[in-house]
Amino acid sequence: MSDEQPAEDETEEAAAESEDTQEVAANAKLFGKWDVAEIHYEDPSTRRYLAVTPVAHTMGRHAQKQFKKSEISIVERLANRLMKTGANAGKKQQALKIVRDAFDIVHERTDENPIQVLVSAVENAAPREETVRLKYGGISVPQAVDTAPQRRVDQALKFLADGAHSASFKTPTDAAEALANQLAGAADYNVQTYAIGQKKEKERVAAAAR
């Protein structure tokens, strides 16, 4: 009996520690500020590809696994997109700082959770169709095709990052402010925003190629 009692105590302690760990994980916030629990999705087709977690840096654990990028937080994927080839290549901490500062600006302007603003921006900036080139007898013919949900998210992140880069490169506008403008504008479906403009252009070309 004396041997069984310590074993039971250890089991109870382990269970209590597990519950505490789960509670801490459930209450964890992105950048120590933003709640990831109550995020609403308007587009059911892209929902499974818009992962939201309190972890903003996974150390590239899914880098060599096909399609595993969809399990990475959409915030980290945006930061990865900001590390364009060139001066920003490999500067992950700098990219995360830009995203963190942009979130603060978005919250000041809209008084909303910036993660929700990002999710809405990605949903709005994701093109629904695009074109591919088919060859018939040596002649290239554009053909409209539906865009896969995962590619829609990829394209939206690209448009948002490119818009922030073009608005802040060799201009007085700070990178964080430029990104905040893109996120807020795309979330409101402002056609003057670079990301929304690129989406509409892709869909316009696809409509002409039907």
Swiss-Prot record:
Top-level taxon of the source organism: Archaea
Molecular-function annotations in GO: mRNA binding; rRNA binding; structural constituent of ribosome
Keywords from the UniProt entry: Ribonucleoprotein, Ribosomal protein, RNA-binding, rRNA-binding
Listed InterPro entries: Ribosomal_uS7, Ribosomal_uS7_arc, Ribosomal_uS7_CS, Ribosomal_uS7_dom, Ribosomal_uS7_dom_sf, Ribosomal_uS7_euk/arc
Region of interest (Disordered), residue spans: 1-23
Record-linked Gene3D superfamilies: Ribosomal protein S7 domain
GO cellular component: cytosolic small ribosomal subunit; ribosome
PROSITE patterns named among the record's database cross-references: RIBOSOMAL_S7 (PS00052)
Name of one Pfam family that matches: Ribosomal_S7
Oligomer and partners: Part of the 30S ribosomal subunit. Contacts proteins S9 and S11.
Family: Belongs to the universal ribosomal protein uS7 family.
General function of this protein: One of the primary rRNA binding proteins, it binds directly to 16S rRNA where it nucleates assembly of the head domain of the 30S subunit. Is located at the subunit interface close to the decoding center.
Identification of the protein by name: Small ribosomal subunit protein uS7
